[in-house]
A protein has these predicted regions:
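N-terminal auxiliary segments of SAM/dcSAM-dependent transferases
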Residues: 1-64
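Conserved SAM-binding loop and adjacent beta-strand
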Residues: 2-3, 73-86
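Glycine-rich helix-loop-beta junction characteristic of Rossmann-like nucleotide cofactor-binding loops
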Residues: 91-96, 118, 163-165, 187
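Conserved class I S-adenosyl-L-methionine
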Residues: 96-107
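Conserved SAM-binding loop of SAM-dependent methyltransferases across substrates and taxa
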Residues: 108-121, 186-187
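Short beta-strand element of Class I
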Residues: 122-128, 195
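C-terminal substrate-binding/active-site "lid" region of AdoMet-derived donor-dependent transferases
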Residues: 179-249
Length: 259
């Protein structure tokens, strides 16, 4: 990736109050804000990390968005899985280059984008999404960050009715009743494959764990991730007054070979 901004690039503009704006550069384009106008031509051909001034003199820092920043700013319909959970999902599910993954509950495509970047060009992600409008938005978001040439197949279908693929390495679920998918996952995954589910409530987790316990899974864990920032300014060092606490529970299980 070049360090020079080009037309078509996604750019994150950050003001002195850390407010962020995601734009796509286009020749002759303009970004309008309460602090004035930024002309896209003032960015195209310039190096990443520069400070640009609006027509009213406000200063904005221009950078390419990281995946975490993109997830927080991208268009969404469904609620997204946030970066604090996406990172642990990639580690707990041991998502590796070349992995074959089934994801259900594609939503706005935040986790899909992270999975695709982790598996690289030799892997594949098949997404099941019951709503066509969510599927189309997810595709736009994925392509907006990774480009069009990605190993992704999003299908508008209900995973509760079954999974066609076989020998999957991973099944990743973000839907209300993942226990209805456990049987399908045992048929679709290879031995040693990993099932991971993201759920907002502990009652859902309990129901899922019951179904997992009745299937040939082992090494089962459930956890949640809490994120707390710190205020560091001179001699003033303390935890932030606010933290990103509960967003969801992560449950992970390994498919075993029955005795």
């Amino acid at each position: 990736m070049s360090g020079i901004f080009r037309a078509g690039d996604r750019v994150l503009l950050v003001d002195n109050r850390k407010r962020r704006h995601l734009i796509t550069l286009a020749g002759g384009g303009e970004f309008h804000t309460h602090a004035g106008i930024v002309r896209h031509d003032d960015l195209i051909g310039k190096p990443e990390g520069l400070t640009v001034r609006t027509t009213r003199g406000a200063r904005l820092t221009a950078v390419r968005p990281t995946l975490a920043e993109y997830v927080l700013e991208m268009p969404r319909g469904a609620q997204v899985i946030y970066p604090k959970d996406i990172g642990p999902i990639l580690i707990l599910a041991d998502v590796f280059p070349g992995a074959r993954i089934l994801e259900s509950g594609v939503g706005s495509g935040a986790l899909t984008t992270a999975l695709l970047r982790a598996i690289g060009p030799t892997g594949s992600v098949t997404g099941y999404e019951i709503r066509d409008d969510f599927a189309q938005r997810a595709l736009r978001n994925v392509h907006g960050f990774l480009g069009d040439d990605v190993p992704l197949d999003v299908q508008v279908r209900d995973v509760y009715e079954g999974i066609d693929a076989r020998d999957l390495d991973r099944v990743v679920l973000d839907l209300p009743e993942p226990w209805r998918v456990v049987k399908h996952a045992t048929e679709a995954m290879r031995p040693g494959g990993i099932l991971l589910a993201y759920l907002p409530t502990i009652l859902q987790v309990g129901r899922l764990r019951e179904e997992i316990a009745a299937a040939p899974f082992g090494m089962v864990d459930t956890l949640e991730v809490l994120q707390r920032g710190w205020h560091v300014e001179g001699q003033s060092i303390r935890p932030d007054h606010r933290m990103v606490a509960h967003t969801g529970f992560l449950t992970v299980a390994r498919l075993l070979t029955p005795e």
